[in-house]
Regions:
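Hydrophobic residues positioned within well-ordered beta-strands of beta-sheet architectures
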Residues: 114-116, 131-133, 149-151, 181, ...
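Acidic (Asp/Glu-rich), glycine- and aromatic
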Residues: 24-27, 32-42, 142-192
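Active-site/ligand-binding surface loops and adjacent short beta/alpha elements
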Residues: 160-233
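Beta-strand elements of well-folded, non-transmembrane domains
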Residues: 47, 118-124, 135-139, 155-159, ...
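Beta-strand-rich N-terminal accessory domains
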Residues: 1-64, 152, 162, 166, ...
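Extracellular/lumen-exposed scaffold segments
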Residues: 33-84, 195-210
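Extended, loop-rich substrate-binding clefts of extracytoplasmic carbohydrate-active enzymes
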Residues: 66-145
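Beta-strand-rich recognition/accessory modules
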Residues: 227-295
Length: 295
C-alpha cells in the first residue's frame, strides 16, 4: 500500500513513501474573523517540500488549500473584511462558518477517499448550505515525482430563497474575482511562473478561462522547485484568479466577474484536480500529463 492515513478528532494526515503529503484539518478552531472552515495544510511534494502557506501576516484567513465563498448573498465565507463598492474592504459582522458534521476516510488500493458532510452558517447563525465534499488522493507516482488530489463538492441551498455567489470583482473591484477553491503558496513562490493550456500563460491569465493552469515555484533552503497543476471543472470554467506577486495564489473561480444564482433546494456541483509535482515542469511536460490523465 502506497498511502498511510493517521486520524485524530480534528484532522486526517496522509503519507506516501514515508512522507506526509497532506493534512486535512476539518475542525480548525479558527478565530471567527478568519471564517472557520476546513483546510489542507501542510501540503507537500513527494520529496517533502512544502507547497502551501498558513495564516500569512498579510491575510491571516489564507490557509493552504481551502473551499471558500468570498461573497454569498451579502455574507462572507472567506474571512477578513468584505469588499464594498466605492468603500473598499470593510470589516462587517458577516463572516460565516463551514462546519464539519461527519467525515469518513477509506483507502482502497492506492487511492484514499475522504467523504465529508458540512453545513454553512452565517455569523447570525442562519443555516444556508448543506455541502457534500469528496476528496481523493491518487496517482502517486514516485518515478514521476507527482501525486494528485481530486476535490469535488455539492453545495445545496437550504436557505429558503436564492443564493448569489459573487466576488470582489462582481462588487466593483476589477481583476479580483476570487471565490471557491483557493490555494495560497509559500512566500518563496512569489514571482513564480504561470503556464496555462493552449499556449497561454503569465499573470495575464487573471480572469481568463483555461482547461488547466500550472504554477511553478522555487523553494527556499533547498535547491529544488515544485509545480502545481490545477484542472478546472470541465463544465464550469468561470475564469482563473491567479497571482504571482505580491504572493502566489491560484483559484478556479466560482464567480469571477458574473454572479451565479443557486435557487433554493438546488445543488451546485463542481470538481477540480490538483497535481503536486517535484521539479519545474515545462509546457511540454504539463501537456503530456494533461493528455495522459484526462479530466
Amino acid at each position: 500500500m502506497t498511502l498511510h492515513v493517521d486520524r485524530t478528532d480534528r484532522a486526517v494526515s496522509v503519507s506516501a513513501h514515508g512522507v506526509e503529503i497532506l493534512c486535512y484539518v476539518h475542525r480548525s478552531g479558527a478565530d471567527p474573523f478568519e471564517g472557520p472552515k476546513p483546510y489542507l495544510h501542510p501540503v507537500r511534494t513527494l520529496a517533502g517540500d512544502m507547497v502551501t502557506a498558513y495564516r500569512p501576516h498579510d491575510h491571516r484567513w489564507h490557509k493552504g488549500l481551502q473551499m471558500t465563498a468570498s461573497h454569498l448573498s451579502g455574507e462572507n465565507f472567506w474571512g477578513g473584511g468584505s469588499y464594498v463598492r466605492d468603500q473598499g474592504y470593510v470589516d462587517l459582522p458577516n463572516v460565516g462558518t463551514m462546519r464539519d458534521e461527519e467525515l469518513t476516510a477509506q483507502v482502497t488500493g492506492d487511492r484514499l477517499t475522504i467523504t465529508e458532510r458540512l453545513t454553512w452558517h452565517t455569523q447570525a447563525g442562519e443555516h444556508w448550505v448543506d455541502e457534500l465534499r469528496t476528496m481523493a488522493v491518487c496517482d502517486v507516482d514516485a518515478e514521476d515525482g507527482s501525486w494528485a488530489l481530486e476535490f469535488g463538492t455539492s453545495l445545496r441551498n437550504v436557505r429558503g430563497e436564492p443564493l448569489e455567489f459573487g466576488s470582489p470583482t462582481t462588487h466593483g473591484r476589477p481583476m479580483a474575482g476570487y471565490s471557491g477553491l483557493f490555494w495560497r503558496g509559500p512566500r518563496a513562490f512569489t514571482d513564480g511562473e504561470v503556464i496555462a493550456a493552449d499556449g497561454q500563460g503569465g499573470p495575464e491569465m487573471m480572469g481568463r478561462p483555461a482547461r488547466w493552469l500550472a504554477y511553478v515555484g522555487r523553494h527556499d533552503e533547498v535547491d529544488r522547485s515544485a509545480t502545481l497543476l490545477f484542472f478546472d471543472d470541465p463544465g464550469y470554467a468561470s475564469g482563473w484568479f491567479v497571482r504571482n506577486t505580491p504572493f502566489a495564489a491560484v483559484n478556479p473561480s466560482l464567480a469571477f466577474d458574473k454572479e451565479v444564482t443557486l435557487p433554493h433546494g438546488e445543488t451546485l456541483d463542481v470538481r477540480y484536480r490538483i497535481v503536486v509535482a517535484d521539479a519545474a515542469w515545462d509546457r511540454d511536460r504539463l501537456e503530456r500529463y494533461a493528455e495522459t490523465h484526462p479530466w
